[in-house]
């Protein structure tokens, strides 16, 4: 743990353009810019960075992370029991607004404390606690204690003797926990009593037992959520599939590893990619088939849950491609296996994806620009509106298949709070293809970066330069910005913007459904000005009037956060556009004046301060962090202001 904190402290110091000679330099040299570039370029070499020379030590890092996550969850649930209103919420889930915790900031007035407490509750934790059977704060405290004990167990598990045992045994443990959780839901969750009665009516009948574990419940009209039997069936299925996969892994001896040497980056790449896909699917399922009781009545929590999981899913999937590229650079030797065959056909893969993105880009943006021009020229009847025929056909298949799936009529009908199969329009057709453009472009950048990580027609010996490098000198023109790290850097902007597109679309769609104004959104989503005017600008109104010279309202804190996040987002562009040169001159000038005045700078003697500049990689990294964090926090405040 000390090594981890030491590395974290050094990384923080390395970001600063001022360094102290007394810092341990290692083999990276005296120049802070060079040292930071080397650390950043090798940050994924966990064996070197953390001085780890055994698989068990590397595996211990994962369990340490799980322990920290469990402790964070324990603190969260403790505060709900200590200063929340959970017991009042379960007595009247439709009339009581759940709160997070008290605000102890002395700068808040009592009025602002009261309004901010309610406004902060944009999460479904209360709904989950009620759905799984919690009925009192005392039970929440016991659950918190259980989380803390489990966190301690995670640290003990890091001492296991075999990584293979941890990997396969961990999958088995998760599978059995999933099956046991299904049993907990059937016996203790609200509404489970009728399920127990079904089994007890005919304990010797297999049919009665299967009735508990099928999709016969559907959406309940009172809670607007799936029946407990559906959720229990889901967890039983997950457990059985997990046990089956674990058995396959034991038999195959990790033969799925493409006959390559063991690679942590390959394992992590596959895990991140699958995890990203499942997380994105969960975002869709949480709205269409909500598993938490009364969640659809809470519009803000529903929207936040969707946006939260879409961002996590996109970032996990991006990380999967990144670690796949690191695997090819560091751990893979070209051979006639599955990976080698993929690399042999990379030109076909990259060119095909390129043509797809060009087709989507020209057609989707071209349609939007045409429709904007027609609306601006006063002839909106000349807009191109394409009927989503294929999507309508898919919806009809769902309706026809209702008896087969056994979902029940409530599952496929619109309600005041959710719509399983909403009516789609030409605007939906356009935005779906715009989202497809963003997704395919992101995948193109990531796949190209990974498949070209060992070498390309322009740069055949790229692998010898490592995962990240700046340029290979003027003698090899075009070798700048083509490392695998650079592809991740570019793709992260694309994936951030793509997630914004489909969260914008989801949010506007559900807002129009909740407000019964679908006709307006269907018409105005056909052109870009409609998106800006009727979604972004119109829904900013509540935040923009959060506080003024006459006072403030209950959204004032979020209006302030909206402004602050905008500033962080804009700061990102400053670093992205103005790289090494500007900061070099600025820092040199500042250091010169301090040395000339014989001043002490940040408590250090003048003779131990060396002026250095931000490298291109430094500025890109800092700019990307500001851009993404500012963008997400800006949208967070926007969702609260527009939905609440």
Curated annotation (Swiss-Prot):
Pfam families, sorted: PsaA_PsaB
Protein family per UniProt: Belongs to the PsaA/PsaB family.
InterPro entries, per the entry: PSI_PsaA/B (IPR001280), PSI_PsaA/B_CS (IPR020586), PSI_PsaA/B_sf (IPR036408)
Transcription regulation among keywords: no
Binding site for phylloquinone: 583
Cofactor: binding details: P700 is a chlorophyll a/chlorophyll a' dimer, A0 is one or more chlorophyll a, A1 is one or both phylloquinones and FX is a shared 4Fe-4S iron-sulfur center.
Binding site for chlorophyll a B3: 574, 582
Catalytic activity entry: reduced [plastocyanin] + hnu + oxidized [2Fe-2S]-[ferredoxin] = oxidized [plastocyanin] + reduced [2Fe-2S]-[ferredoxin]
GO terms of biological process kind: photosynthesis
Record function comment: PsaA and PsaB bind P700, the primary electron donor of photosystem I (PSI), as well as the electron acceptors A0, A1 and FX. PSI is a plastocyanin/cytochrome c6-ferredoxin oxidoreductase, converting photonic excitation into a charge separation, which transfers an electron from the donor P700 chlorophyll pair to the spectroscopically characterized acceptors A0, A1, FX, FA and FB in turn. Oxidized P700 is reduced on the lumenal side of the thylakoid membrane by plastocyanin or cytochrome c6.
Organism of origin: Amphidinium carterae (Dinoflagellate)
Name under which the protein is recorded: Photosystem I P700 chlorophyll a apoprotein A2
Domain of life of the organism encoding this protein: Eukaryota
Enzyme Commission number, as recorded: 1.97.1.12
């Amino acid at each position: 743990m000390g090594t981890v904190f030491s590395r974290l402290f050094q990384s923080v110091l390395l970001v600063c353009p001022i360094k102290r000679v007394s810092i341990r330099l290692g083999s990276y040299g005296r120049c802070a810019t060079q040292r930071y570039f080397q650390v950043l370029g090798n940050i994924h070499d966990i064996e070197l960075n953390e001085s780890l020379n055994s698989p068990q030590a590397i595996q211990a890092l994962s369990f340490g992370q799980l322990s920290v996550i469990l402790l964070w969850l324990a603190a969260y649930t403790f505060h709900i029991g200590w200063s929340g209103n959970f017991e009042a919420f379960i007595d009247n889930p439709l009339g009581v607004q759940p709160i997070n915790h008290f605000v102890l900031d002395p700068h808040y007035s009592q009025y602002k404390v009261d309004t901010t407490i309610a406004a902060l509750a944009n999460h479904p934790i209360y709904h989950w606690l009620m759905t799984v059977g919690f009925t009192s704060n005392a039970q929440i405290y016991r659950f918190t204690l259980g989380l803390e004990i489990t966190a301690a167990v995670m640290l003990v598990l890091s001492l296991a003797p075999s990584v293979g045992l941890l990997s396969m045994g961990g999958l088995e443990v998760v599978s059995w926990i999933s099956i046991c959780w299904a049993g907990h839901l059937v016996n203790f969750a609200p509404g489970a009593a009728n399920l127990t009665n079904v089994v007890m009516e005919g304990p010797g009948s297999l049919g009665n037992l299967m009735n508990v574990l099928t999709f016969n419940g559907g959406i309940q009209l009172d809670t607007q959520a799936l029946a407990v039997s559906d959720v229990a069936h889901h967890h039983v299925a997950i457990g059985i599939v997990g046990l089956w996969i674990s058995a396959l892994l034991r038999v195959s001896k990790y033969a799925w590893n493409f006959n390559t040497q063991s690679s942590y980056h390959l394992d992590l790449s596959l895990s991140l990619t699958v995890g990203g896909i499942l997380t994105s699917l969960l975002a869709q399922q949480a709205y269409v088939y909500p598993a938490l009781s009364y969640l659809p009545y809470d519009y803000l929590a529903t929207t936040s849950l969707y946006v939260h999981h879409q961002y996590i899913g996109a970032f996990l999937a991006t990380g999967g491609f990144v670690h796949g590229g690191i695997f090819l650079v560091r751990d893979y030797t070209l051979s006639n296996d599955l990976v080698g065959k993929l690399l042999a056909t990379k030109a076909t893969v990259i060119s095909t994806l390129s043509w797809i993105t060009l087709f989507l880009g020209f057609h989707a943006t071209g349609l939007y620009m045409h429709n904007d021009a027609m609306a601006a020229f006063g002839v909106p009847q000349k807009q191109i509106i394409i009927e989503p025929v294929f999507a309508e056909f898919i919806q009809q298949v769902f309706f026809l298949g209702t008896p087969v799936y056994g979902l029940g009529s409530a599952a496929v009908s619109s309600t005041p709070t959710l719509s399983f199969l909403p009516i789609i329009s030409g605007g939906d057709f356009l935005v779906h293809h715009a989202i497809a453009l963003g997704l395919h472009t992101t995948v193109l950048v990531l796949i190209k970066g990974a498949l070209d990580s060992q070498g390309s027609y322009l740069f055949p010996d790229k692998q010898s330069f490592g995962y990240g490098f700046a340029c290979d000198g003027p003698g090899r023109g075009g070798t700048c910005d083509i490392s695998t790290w650079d592809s991740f850097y570019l793709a992260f902007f694309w994936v951030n913007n793509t997630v914004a597109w489909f969260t914008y679309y989801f949010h506007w769609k559900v807002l129009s459904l909740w407000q019964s104004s679908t006709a307006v959104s269907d018409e105005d989503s056909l052109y870009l000005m409609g998106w800006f005017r009727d979604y972004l600008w119109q829904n900013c109104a509540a935040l923009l009037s959060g506080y003024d010279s006459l006072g403030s309202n209950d959204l004032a804190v979020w209006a302030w956060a909206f402004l602050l996040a905008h500033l962080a987002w804009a700061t990102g562009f400053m670093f992205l556009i103005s790289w090494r040169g500007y900061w070099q001159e600025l820092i040199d000038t500042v250091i010169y004046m301090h040395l000339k005045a014989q001043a002490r700078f940040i408590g250090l003697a003048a003779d131990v301060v060396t002026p250095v500049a931000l490298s291109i990689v430094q500025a890109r990294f800092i700019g990307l962090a500001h851009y993404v964090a500012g963008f997400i926090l800006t949208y967070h405040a926007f969702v609260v202001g527009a939905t609440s």
